[in-house]
Amino acid sequence: MDITAPAHVLVFRPLIALMRERGDEVEVTARDYAQTVQLLEQHGIEAELIGHHGGRSRIGKLATMVTRLSKLRRWARGRNFDAALAHGSHHLTLTARALGIPSSTTFDYEFATVQHQLGCRAATFVVVPDAIPPERLERYGVRPPKLRQYPGLKEEYYLSDFEPRESVLDELAVDRDRILVVVRTPPDVSLYHRKSNPLFPQVLTFLGSEDSVQAVVLPRTEEQRDYVRGLSLPSVTVPDGAVDAQSLIAFADLVVSAGGTMNREAAALGIPVYTTYGGRLGGVDEALIREGRLRPLTDPRALELVKRGSEGLRVRREPAEMLRLLMPV
């Protein structure tokens, strides 16, 4: 397994446990990016660290990819792997293809064109939610039987055994009398870059000046952390490092996220969630919006800042079914 982003740790945690319970040998590689290493440590997953993120520039990403592919091949060669699993890591599927190892990759956003052109064509199987129309994947060379689809959200599978820790509120000094808003930064490395999502700073400024609100902002990088802290907004809290984000979401009154994973975690846990994503919506988000489980946000003043009164509808699914679809052998 190759883990290249923080969310992948959560996806693979129950699958690793299931495989080891049945006697499989599992080895994990990881890329040093954002909170990936911290989350691996928190969940007790040992991994071989290989490479790092290439940053914003295409040249940097290409150079980093070439170097990491070479290191992955050297590491994997001669280890007699029977299968390789990835969540969107084209590094893994390309390496597996070069070494003749059956592989599968999964993702839930179909418009990451460059990544999917590489990863999908190299993979033996591609596993995606059934909310993604199959015809959108044909340009990546993905058709049945290579295509496998599952019902619901991947978050409904990996959160199936999750029970939130209320102590996370004390760890972050959350005032329970105020409206708790969990905010996830955009994927942009630089929040203040001219091409960055302009809505996100507006949301921060709006929430940060509301006395009735405590907004906990979860940055992706240290650069983002420094930027948000530098705004000195009175109602904004920025944790020092990786936190139990799923527990925080479970106790939140609402979630505002520019990324995909935290939106879907909130939806899976039945928490009101708004998306500020500025790109093209994928099939999963389109379905969630149709179902009323995700709300698009274009103006911060449209946020319903109220205490959540009742438990939302939580959906749990069986991780073993996800593992069955992912196994390429």
What do the predicted segments below correspond to?
Residues 43-56, 204-239:
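Catalytic donor nucleotide-activated moiety binding site of glycosyltransferases and closely related
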Residues 104-106, 116-128, 249:
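A conserved, positively charged/aromatic
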Residues 84-95, 105-106, 248-285:
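A donor-sugar binding/catalytic signature common to diverse glycosyltransferases
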